[in-house]
Amino acid sequence: MATTLPVQRHPRSLFPEFSELFAAFPSFAGLRPTFDTRLMRLEDEMKEGRYEVRAELPGVDPDKDVDIMVRDGQLTIKAERTEQKDFDGRSEFAYGSFVRTVSLPVGADEDDIKATYDKGILTVSVAVSEGKPTEKHIQIRSTN
């Protein structure tokens, strides 16, 4: 089966295990490192003529905490999470900002983008035209 998607759509983390490194160490007084190394987890696929990106964003309010933008063939999802957990007579805040950018496939229609949020999963759907990519041959001039 042939695909029209670019080979590499978005950069991968150089150190995907970095966040697991901190999880391996016990927390002192219930504290974790003050910086968040987690990435926004994404899945993408072509589905019925549309490019779909699904982002795992539990615990956010999509109306207030999520911003989706498109520019020059790049789709960017920004989210911010702030939550407070109470347990064993203590409370702990969990917060962080997340940003991911993916390149849209050839033929993506930046004017036909839809987004939904359900049970912690943000789905962004972009229409993609079925047209075949065109080739252009370049004439070479001799300078001799």
Swiss-Prot record:
Gene3D superfamilies from the UniProt entry: 2.60.40.790
Compartments in which it is found: Cytoplasm; Secreted, Cell wall
Keyword tRNA-binding in record: no
InterPro entries: A-crystallin/Hsp20_dom, HSP20-like_chaperone, Small_HSP
UniProt function note: Acts as a chaperone, as it has a significant ability to suppress the thermal denaturation of alcohol dehydrogenase. Cells overexpressing this gene grow more slowly than wild-type cells, and are less susceptible to autolysis following saturation of the culture in vitro, suggesting this protein may slow down the growth rate of M.tuberculosis in culture and by extension during macrophage infection.
Entry similarity comment: Belongs to the small heat shock protein (HSP20) family.
Protein name listed in UniProt: Alpha-crystallin
Source organism: Mycobacterium tuberculosis (strain ATCC 25618 / H37Rv)
Gene from which the chain derives: hspX
